[in-house]
């Protein structure tokens, strides 16, 4: 399955601090310009965006004049000045003009990786895309894995899009995990009853449930639990699968003992089969109901073919079978209850 080294010396890495932003060189002034600042979730350390934290008034389009007092020009690499700043603070001097006069200096905390911010940006772009294409009727939930993060994002999305007519569940690039069945059960929930509290909006039981149509997106990087998730989704009849065939890897390993030198060798230990006593998914994957290939040249232009097809399919389903909106009835005349019970 997998192996890893033991008592080998590891090269000590030099951590370079990152800003959660894109820098471009302004040819006219020879200064660096902050062309994009990635939005973050600053309560979550893995998604913290340094330039959006409280007290840091840096905007897209500002010029990065200096780092830790060293003035920058276009021939310098700004990240050299951010070496060994992870877990520490750094001073950024910025200005709306490419000059030092009127510049302001902010103390920020650089981050070690921008991967989560880039992923969050990708997700937010698709949320906006779905909202625009569907006229606000469809919600979009990206599920990065079938473990802690994926379960959290699914719950958050189900809360946020509780009132949407339809849902897109994006399983593309899903890294797997051990709870795809739990997540599928959440998608399967239907509303059992409604509650009207005086003066407030109606509530429902269960609090997280969605009654409308759903689509799941897959690709060749939907792996392990990301294979099982669409398989269970289809088996429960929850909706249409769109995209390309999944990775096809559900022979697994767990609990392998380590070796004496600190390394390990993991051995395949279990595989998946169905009620017909047939081995499934491994080496084959889960094929979509509608095949759509995400062409690189289209993605580079900001086009997401799977998203567009999913919206098209769901809007057609909503047109053919509109979701019934359940409204609270008029308040009951409780004086007549005794008569009604006779």
Name what the model sees in each region.
Residues 128-129, 222-224, 259-291:
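Metal-dependent DNA phosphodiester-chemistry modules and their immediately adjacent helices/loops
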Residues 24, 93-97, 273:
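A generic structural motif
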Residues 6-12, 33-35, 41-52, 65-263, ...:
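Cleft-lining beta-strand/loop regions that shape enzyme active-site pockets
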Residues 21-44, 58:
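Active-site-adjacent "gating/activation" loops or surface patches in catalytic cores
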Residues 94, 282, 300-301, 305-308, ...:
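Conserved functional hotspot residues or short segments at active or partner-binding sites
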Residues 1-27:
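Extended boundary segments
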Residues 291-298:
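C-terminal or mid-to-C-terminal helical accessory/interaction module adjacent to the motor/catalytic core
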